[in-house]
Every structure is written in C-alpha cells, then in structure tokens.
C-alpha cells in the first residue's frame, strides 16, 4: 500500500524580468498551478528586444521542459516542450515527473506579477500495518 504525501508546496510571485533557471526536483512528482498570468504571449514576442530573432526562438513568459539527447552518431542536442502562456492558462495545473528539467522565462510587457503555486509529491510505501506508525 502506498501513501501519497505532499512533500512541500510554495507560491511564486514573479515580476517583470524575473525567471527560474533550469532545475528539477527530488520528489516523485511535481506540479505547478498558474494562478495569475498578467501578459499575453503574442504581445510578449513582439517586444523590440527580440528583433532579429526567429519567432520560434522567442520564449518570453513561457514554461519549458527540456532533456538532453544524442543520436547514434554521438551528436548532442536538446529536446524541449514549451508552453506559451497567457491568461487562458490561469487555473490550470500541470503535473509532471520531478526529475524532468524545466525553466520559466521572464516576461516584459507588464508591471503586474505572475503568481503560481508549485509543489512536490512523494509516496510512502507500507509493507505491513506496523510500518504505518
């Protein structure tokens, strides 16, 4: 029998230019709930700081998972999946394996804060009734 344990949780309040660098967590699963997203991705990518870059390389305000990879010839690369966030994501929970590397990019178009609730979940394994104590 397994018991689900909310190991930790916290609120993130991020303002313009703030970000979370690439990281992962030590639990089994993690989650993020977007409570407030004060910007629109389509507005963010038009910011003048991105002139001269490909639209696909512009990631302001985004949440991204990535993992290194290599092919049979030893060529190294990175696979990624990017969530282009806007107000429509408010109230959405994303649940993922904690060891999956992820990052949060800064936003630029507003002085309002982005608010998320994040946490880590573990399992406790009970082999018999005496282990529950």
Tell what function each PLM region has.
Residues 2-3, 109-111:
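A short beta-turn/loop motif at secondary-structure boundaries
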Residues 3-11:
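A short glycine-rich, His/Asp/Glu-containing loop-to-beta-strand
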Residues 10-95, 105, 112, 127:
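Catalytic core of non-heme Fe(II) oxygenases with the double-stranded beta-helix
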Residues 99-103:
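Short, charged beta-turn/beta-strand-edge "cap" motif at the junction between a beta-strand
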Residues 110-121:
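A short alpha/beta connector and helix-capping loop motif
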Residues 119-133:
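Double-stranded beta-helix
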